[in-house]
Amino acid sequence: MTSYIYHYQWHGRAGSSVPLIVWPHGGPHSVITTDFKTIVMFFCQLGYGVLYVNYRGSLGFGEDNVRSLLGRVGDQDVQDCHEATLAALDNLPQLARDKVVLMGGSHGGFLVTHLTGQFPDLYKAAVAINPVTNLASLAGVSDIPDWSFNEAGLKYKYLHPTPENLATMWDKSPIKHIENIKAPILLLIGKKDLRVNPTQGYEFYHSLKALGKTVEMNVYEDNHPIGKFEHALDWKINSALFLNKHLRL
């Protein structure tokens, strides 16, 4: 597989390094483009590098690429994000290997929570915005109930999933790896989210709490993107404060 890293010219001091935010997109069948993004500029102004990842399954690389992810979520996409992180760290010495954190929403939140559980020693903190944490419990409460089936590689059942279906979904979910998590996690949840029901965040929060993990949760009177101006401003500022605190910046 051939992959590429596009990055801006380094303008920092020689020999210095910056913390890295790894930010997988949602969807999963969407794409990150190189257009101007205020959220990236916000974190860059705070001294972070930002790595966006178009993992296999993203749009713009052909139908076979899109379909390659079906049945492989929680594995192929997670591995791609992790490999992209390692490639960036190996090729860009201005990135601090001991200060790698995660951000992502929806399926990006699915990947963020997966990465903290599958690679607990690399990622030091994570912010998950309306994350999918359990495909099995999401199947009955999302406004797109076929999503959990299709992404798990299953045929959509109009009536109800079988126990075997639910076991397959759970096996591909971040909650499977929750006991391995070491990184502090901030969950940002929209109470009116119809796409990823807020119970996904609540379930993960209470499970982390029960395990004695470090977790915080902010809940907003908002929907899937948490896009109302006052709410978006709040979660961005709180995300920065959370990451700074746990990286001791």
Where are these regions (language model features)?
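A short loop-to-beta-strand scaffold at the N-terminal edge of the catalytic core in hydrolase folds
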Residues: 1-12, 20
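Generic structural signal for residues in well-ordered beta-strands
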Residues: 3, 50, 215-217
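Glycine/threonine-rich flexible loop motifs
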Residues: 29-35, 60
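Short amphipathic alpha-helix adjacent to the substrate-entry channel of hydrolases
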Residues: 34-53
